Structures are given as C-alpha cells and as structure tokens.
C-alpha cells in the first residue's frame, strides 16, 4: 500500500475470513493492526488473486504474494491455457465468453486480432502434413479471432474437455462445439494439448517484440466510441452478456477489444475531465484501478450516425436506478449496481471518442 502521508510503500498482511467475509490488515513492520478484523461484504474471494488490486475502505492494496497454506488452498494445480475463438459471427462472442466464465475459468488476458500464416502453422503443428491443413490455415487467417488466457485448476485439460471433440456432431452434449459449432472446420474455438504449448502460444499472441505487439491491436481510432467494462462486471460474470447486447444491437459492432490493468494514476488521468464535475470522481478512479477492465472500440454500422451519441443511449444514464425506471433495456439498467459500479464507462462527448480509445489502445497498450 502507498502511504501518501509517509510518501512510502508499506508492506502489509491481509487476512481474509471467507466464512463471514471479514478482513484484517496487519502492519508487520510496526507490529500492529492497521485494520482490526471487520466484516467487509464488497470483497469477494475471486478478487484475491496475485497481481490484483483490492480496495479496502478506500485503501488500494496490491496483492504481491500469499502464504504457503493459502497458495496450496487457492492455487493448487492452477494453470494457464491459451484459448482461441475462431472466426465466428460477432453475435456469438458473448455467448462463448459467458460459457467460459460459467465453467469456472478466470480470463486474465484477452484481445481480438488477425493472425498470420506463421502463427497458424504453429497453432496447428499437430496436423502438419494433413491435406486439410491449407484449408484450416486459410480459414483461421482470413477472419478475426479472439485470444484468451484462461486460468483454472488443470486448465489445459479442462478447456479441452469443455470444447468437446473436433466434430461438433459427435461432441458431447453441453460442450462448446456441440452448442455452437457447425462442422470440423468451423468448430468455434481451439485449445492447446500441453502446458508447454499453451505457454508458447500465449507468448506468441500476447507478447511484444521490441515494444511492438506480435499480434497488433485492432483499434482504428476513427468514427468510434470508447466503452470500458468495469472491474465489477468481470467479477459478476456479466462480460459475455454485455458483449452480446452490443453485438446483437442493430446499430453497433465492436471493432477492437482488449483487457487492461489500470494504475490509479492512469485512472485519474483518464477521468480527469470529471474531476471538478462529479463528486464521485475519486471513487470512479479507485474502482477502475481495483482490477482488470475490458476496453472496447465501438463503431456504428451506419456511418452517418454519431457513434458516441448513439452508443450513450444504449448504455443509459450514469445512475443505474434511473436507468431501470426510464431506460429498462439499457446496459446500465441490466448490469449496473450503483453510480460507481454502473457496469460501463462510455464516451460522453462526441469529440472524445477517438481520444479515449487511443488512451487505452495506444498509451496503455504500450505501457
């Protein structure tokens, strides 16, 4: 935790008691409680991940490590795997993301992109020499894909089990390919066979070379609005539902998507226009820095429309309670909790659409 008064970073011990959702914070250096044990309902077990930032009574705590017993309990056999959503209709993306999250996977990295032949050859090296390989390569490289890093116990095997067999017709009921696949080629998604393969593919898809992403971000920074899915949306499991609502609307499509971790200083800079306008400015910044968020570049299908103004209507007013009364079909009416945890941020001013998208997909993407 950064102590502004002392101008230093303090190392603390956070103890979480899941049976009554209480917390205790100890300053081990000074040998005293910074916070005596008290119930704190906003903190969820799912938020206690190494690398996350949690907000305890307006104090931002960065989780750097955990005790051996905690690691054994929470992270036993936990793995990362690489998942690739193949070129499917955008209207299906939300359903697929919802399926993934309901199966108990945590999404820790995510972005859309287009892959080249070299990446595709590496991805399908297990079918090298097959007559079908050129067809597979052509299919996977001509459309847009979404790459995901999924975390769960025994994630590599679990993801392949969730996918089902290659042919959707013979895949087990309830598997992803049985639900949404068309044939052996258009079978929704790809999974790695080994941990080593998953690690290599994650590096290829999300890695950087000389400061440039190997798979470029898809943002165009033209005629667009910015939409940020706030951290609580990810914790609540509503990412897929919001993506589906946007993609199935008649007016909009998502041209770029990526997951980010936002520092408090960046959140303050991004929301600076609201500093002297909204009394909840500080709380907005803290929430955006609490955990991972998902940034979208949203565009209108009809170029004659003002994308920012039209998309703001889909999101609804900032207060979810007001949305539920006046705009019950809006995103914030469905998934917002209060004026801070109101599901999404959307660009307010028409001239700020490109600037806000640039902040995430240029500045933060290369930070």
Short names for language-model regions:
Residues 1-75:
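Extended amphipathic alpha-helical elements
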Residues 3, 20-21, 53, 59-60, ...:
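Non-catalytic terminal and connector segments of soluble metabolic enzymes
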């Amino acid at each position: 935790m950064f102590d502004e008064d002392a101008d230093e970073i303090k190392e603390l011990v956070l103890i979480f008691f899941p049976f009554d959702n209480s917390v205790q914070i100890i300053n081990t250096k000074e040998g005293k409680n910074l916070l005596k044990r008290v119930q704190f309902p906003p903190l969820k077990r799912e938020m206690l991940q190494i690398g996350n930032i949690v907000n305890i009574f307006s104090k931002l705590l960065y989780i750097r490590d955990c005790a051996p017993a905690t690691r054994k309990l929470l992270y036993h056999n936990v793995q990362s795997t690489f998942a690739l959503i193949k070129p499917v209709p955008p209207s299906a993306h939300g359903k697929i993301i919802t399926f993934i999250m309901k199966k108990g996977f945590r999404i820790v990295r995510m972005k859309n992109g287009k892959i080249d032949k070299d990446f595709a050859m590496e991805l399908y090296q297990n079918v090298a020499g097959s007559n079908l390989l050129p067809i597979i390569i052509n299919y996977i490289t001509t459309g847009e894909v979404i790459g995901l890093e999924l975390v769960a116990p025994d994630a590599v095997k679990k993801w392949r089990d969730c996918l089902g067999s290659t042919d959707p017709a013979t895949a087990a009921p309830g598997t992803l390919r049985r639900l949404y696949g068309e044939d052996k080629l258009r079978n929704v998604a790809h999974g790695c066979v080994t941990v080593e393969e998953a690690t290599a593919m994650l590096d290829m898809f999300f890695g950087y070379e000389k400061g440039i992403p190997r798979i470029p971000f898809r943002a165009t920074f033209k005629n667009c609005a910015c939409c940020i899915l706030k951290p609580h949306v990810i914790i609540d499991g509503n990412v897929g539902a919001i993506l589906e609502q946007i993609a199935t609307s008649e007016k909009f499509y998502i041209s770029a998507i990526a997951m980010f971790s936002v520092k408090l200083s960046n959140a303050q800079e991004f929301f600076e226009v609201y500093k002297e306008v909204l009394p909840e400015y500080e709380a907005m910044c803290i929430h955006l820095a609490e955990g991972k968020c998902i940034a979208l570049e949203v565009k209108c299908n009809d170029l004659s429309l003002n994308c920012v103004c039209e998309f703001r209507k889909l999101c609804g007013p900032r207060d979810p309670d007001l949305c539920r009364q006046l705009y019950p079909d809006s995103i914030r009416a469905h998934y917002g909790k209060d004026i801070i945890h109101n599901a999404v941020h959307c660009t307010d001013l028409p001239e700020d659409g490109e600037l806000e998208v640039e902040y995430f997909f240029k500045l933060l993407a290369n930070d």
